[in-house]
A protein has these predicted regions:
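Non-catalytic DNA-recognition/assembly elements of restriction-modification systems
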Residues: 1-35, 164, 168-179, 183-189
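Low-complexity, Lys/Gly-biased intrinsically disordered segments
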Residues: 19-61, 75-79, 150
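A short glycine-rich beta-alpha junction/loop motif
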Residues: 45, 110-119, 150-176
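A generic structural signal for short beta-strands and their flanking turns/coil linkers
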Residues: 49, 67, 115-117
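A short beta-sheet element
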Residues: 54, 74-138, 158
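Short, basic/aromatic beta-hairpin or loop at an interaction surface
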Residues: 57-70, 111-112
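Periplasmic-binding protein-like
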Residues: 142-145
């Protein structure tokens, strides 16, 4: 966080006056499948073809795979949306909102799908790095939560709200310097 602010300023107020873009131009926001093929409790198992993420899998510290639920290949193929590609970022949007996890090569599952309380953020790699986006979003989530605190029993972060979130856009080169720094810090942990 300190390194981010040092390099790019405070994303809440854009203290370094960097160019900005709406979140929807920085990444594609992909909703999960909520249709008639959504799995029932009986269709989940402790092992199987496709990891079906639940709220416990996406934490404030990224992925956690202590409690996993799986669906069969057949069930996975019936679902249209919400399948992850390497490099995708998962964002929780219902209940505990704002948790992020990065689906990179370190995740041991090849087939992963989000549940209905999440979205997939597929970055536009020409303009933004995932790690840069994740660190920036973590710094913004507090004020995002304040703005959407609607008093409802279950907090939600709808895509219509995500459309209004702005992302700092330093050069890709600067983002890469930051990303390399984060990778080094992660290695030393």
């Amino acid at each position: 966080k300190a390194r981010f602010v040092e390099m790019f300023g405070d994303p809440e107020i854009n203290s370094m006056n960097l160019p900005v873009k709406p979140m929807t131009e920085v990444c594609e926001i992909i909703d999960g499948d909520r249709g008639k093929n959504y799995p029932t409790q009986e269709e989940f198992s402790d092992e199987g073809y496709c990891l079906f993420l639940n709220a416990k899998n996406v934490t404030s510290n990224g992925f956690s795979f202590e409690n996993c639920m799986f669906v069969t290949k057949e069930k996975d193929e019936l679902l249209r949306k919400g399948h992850l590609n390497r490099g995708d970022v998962v964002l929780t949007t219902r209940g505990t909102i704002g948790n992020l996890a990065f689906y990179d090569e370190s995740v041991p599952y090849e087939n992963v799908r989000i549940n209905s309380g999440m979205v997939v953020l597929r970055m536009n790699h020409e303009i933004v790095s995932e790690r840069f986006f994740i660190e920036q979003f973590k710094m913004q989530i507090g004020s995002i939560k304040e703005k959407i605190a609607s008093g409802s029993a279950q907090p939600q972060l709808p895509i219509s709200t995500m459309n209004k979130i702005v992302v700092l856009m330093p050069s890709v080169k600067q983002q890469q310097v930051f990303t390399d720094f984060v990778k080094q810090v992660d290695k030393s942990k």
